[in-house]
UniProtKB/Swiss-Prot annotation:
Main location: cytoplasm
SUPFAM superfamilies, A to Z: GroES-like
Keyword set includes NAD: no
Protein's job: Together with the chaperonin GroEL, plays an essential role in assisting protein folding. The GroEL-GroES system forms a nano-cage that allows encapsulation of the non-native substrate proteins and provides a physical environment optimized to promote and accelerate protein folding. GroES binds to the apical surface of the GroEL ring, thereby capping the opening of the GroEL channel.
Family: Belongs to the GroES chaperonin family.
Protein name (Swiss-Prot/TrEMBL): Co-chaperonin GroES
A Gene Ontology molecular function term of the record: metal ion binding
InterPro entries linked to this entry: Chaperonin_GroES (IPR020818), Chaperonin_GroES_sf (IPR037124), Chaprnonin_Cpn10_CS (IPR018369), GroES-like_sf (IPR011032)
Subunit structure and binding partners: Heptamer of 7 subunits arranged in a ring. Interacts with the chaperonin GroEL.
GO annotation terms (biological process): chaperone cofactor-dependent protein refolding
Keyword Chaperone: yes
Length: 94
């Protein structure tokens, strides 16, 4: 499993529906990149210049919305994950 460093989080991106609302099957080129994901792992946080540790606000299991082109995609054990900084997260879905 991946263990993110500092203020990074590991996400499992949720696949979007491959059909339009009208039932038309979309090609991968016409689909927008998904922006919703499940948090799989969370780093310990980032240390400020004054030595204070600032922990990420998300926890494992949270569903989040992230910036459209954020992060780095990594494949591990046949599965694809996205690693990004917690500042690239926009919201927690409740």
């Amino acid at each position: 499993m991946l263990k993110p460093l500092e203020n990074r989080v590991v996400l499992r991106v949720k696949e979007e529906e491959e059909k339009s609302m009208g039932g038309i099957v979309l090609t991968s080129a016409s689909q927008e990149k998904p922006q919703t994901a499940e948090v799989i792992a969370v780093g310990e946080g980032k240390t400020t210049n004054h030595g204070t540790l600032i922990s990420p606000l998300v926890k494992v299991g949270d569903t989040v919305i992230f910036e459209k082109f954020a992060g780095t995609t990594v494949k591990m054990d046949g599965e694809e994950f996205l690693i990004l900084k917690d500042s690239d997260l926009l919201a927690i879905v409740e």
